[in-house]
Amino acid sequence: MALKMRFLYYSKKAKMKDLAEAIKKEFDLAQNYNAIDVIPPAYSCENERLVILALSGNDLDDMVRRFCRELDKKKAQNVALLIDGNDKVAQTALDVLKETGTNVIENVKMVKFGGLPFIGGKLSDDEKKDLLDWAHSVVDSIK
């Protein structure tokens, strides 16, 4: 049985959408039509085994902060962070998520996608491999 998992992102960068699609394909999430979505998602999380939050920016947006505050154990048992930004965003998101009582994966992935929103092309093969390896390590850590 496949892992009940979602990849939610807050970014306008093309590489983030590309990564979302790669995760969906790698973990065979096609049966779940809302497995990848933007924050806030069209359908709320419910009893997810893992939610990967991918955030871009140098500050945690208030809408994202509110969304994170709602991710309790009933909505997401485990949450992992992928940050395209600075340590401040990562630490703020970690602090907010830990307050909810959900298990926050300590292995936060920091990336620098760079480029302008909607421009920046696709993930390189090396970037894709690195990010998928990280995602597998997160999934393995909760099995």
Language model feature labels by segment:
Residues 38-43:
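Short acidic active-site motifs
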Residues 3-6, 26-34, 46-143:
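FMN-binding flavodoxin-like domain, especially the glycine-rich phosphate-binding loop
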Residues 2-26:
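N-terminal beta1-alpha1 ligand-phosphate binding loop
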